[in-house]
Swiss-Prot record:
This is Subtilisin DY. Keywords: Calcium, Hydrolase, Metal-binding, Protease, Secreted, Serine protease, Sporulation. Binds 2 calcium ions per subunit. Residues 5-273 form the Peptidase S8 domain. CDD domains: Peptidases_S8_Subtilisin_subset. Ca(2+) 1 binds at Q2, D41, L74, N76, V80. Secretion of subtilisin is associated with onset of sporulation, and many mutations which block sporulation at early stages affect expression levels of subtilisin. However, subtilisin is not necessary for normal sporulation. It comes from Bacillus licheniformis. It comes from the Bacteria. Pfam families: Peptidase_S8. It is an enzyme of class 3 (hydrolase). The keyword Kinase does not apply. Belongs to the peptidase S8 family.
């Protein structure tokens, strides 16, 4: 049997899938620790590695494989179901098996996505400060037509200070915070003026290396729900620009409260793909 994680109906991705839109012909890049391409619930069609000695289609950490499943786990009667199971999935490895990496590797990954005509990129990663090269890379990606999605960060509210990380904090990037199954903000979810939308990020069940599955918490888990939602919109309306897709997601989100803590609210991809 196939498990449908709670996040799929919570963002109404099930409704869009039922219309026949599942992300076909949309190229999504997971900029992360790589993807365990041997997993039977994932189909990786390409990628690149910017971590020396590691190939893109392996994942010694697990993070990237989990993120990938939330976007794209196959609709195949087994395992779990992703938000957009028919996307063309690309593994862009910029973080090592410990989950750490350099801004230069991340920049190279973003540039690879831009050069290879990807439609959506997910960055479930971040740091407390940015870099000129990182800003230029995400700005260029967005200008080239890529929907750029990133985890807002797991630094909490820290006495209501702005805790949004980079690259999420940049204008060209959709910063995604985390809610639980009851639509309450996760205590760890970063806050700030740049926070754009919320998605499920508590006890998210997805693919994991060695052909297994596990539940994880984090804005890292919320971000791929939004990347997948963008892919669903693009599979229904292939001619939309990145800014149009972004606007649909934010303008149709369900308000959950103060924008400093919730952005525009929980994404509703059924409404966004009207």
């Amino acid at each position: 049997a196939q498990t449908v994680p709670y996040g799929i109906p919570l963002i109404k991705a099930d409704k869009v899938q039922a219309q026949g839109y599942k992300g076909a012909n949309v190229k999504v890049g997971i900029i992360d620790t790589g993807i365990a391409a041997s997993h039977t619930d994932l189909k990786v069609v390409g990628g690149a590695s910017f971590v020396s000695g590691e190939s893109y289609n392996t994942d010694g950490n697990g993070h990237g494989t989990h993120v990938a499943g939330t976007v794209a786990a196959l609709d195949n009667t087994t395992g779990v179901l992703g938000v957009a199971p028919n996307v063309s999935l690309y593994a862009i490895k910029v973080l090592n098996s410990s989950g750490s990496g350099t801004y230069s590797a991340i920049v190279s990954g973003i540039e690879w996505a831009t050069q290879n005509g990807l439609d959506v990129i997910n960055m479930s990663l971040g740091g407390p400060s940015g870099s000129t090269a990182l800003k230029q890379a995400v700005d260029k990606a967005y200008a080239s037509g890529i929907v750029v999605v990133a985890a807002a960060g797991n630094s909490g509210s820290s006495g209501s200070q702005n805790t949004i990380g980079y690259p999420a904090k940049y204008d060209s990037v959709i910063a995604v915070g985390a809610v639980d199954s009851n639509k309450n903000r996760a205590s760890f979810s970063s806050v700030g003026a740049e926070l754009e939308v919320m998605a499920p990020g508590v006890s998210v069940y997805s693919t994991y290396p060695s052909n297994t599955y596990t539940s994880l918490n984090g804005t890292s888990m919320a971000s791929p729900h939004v990347a997948g939602a963008a892919a669903l919109i693009l599979s229904k309306y292939p001619t939309l620009s990145a800014s149009q897709v972004r606007n649909r997601l934010s303008s149709t989100a369900t308000n959950l409260g103060d924008s400093f803590y919730y952005g525009k609210g929980l994404i509703n991809v059924e409404a966004a793909a009207q």
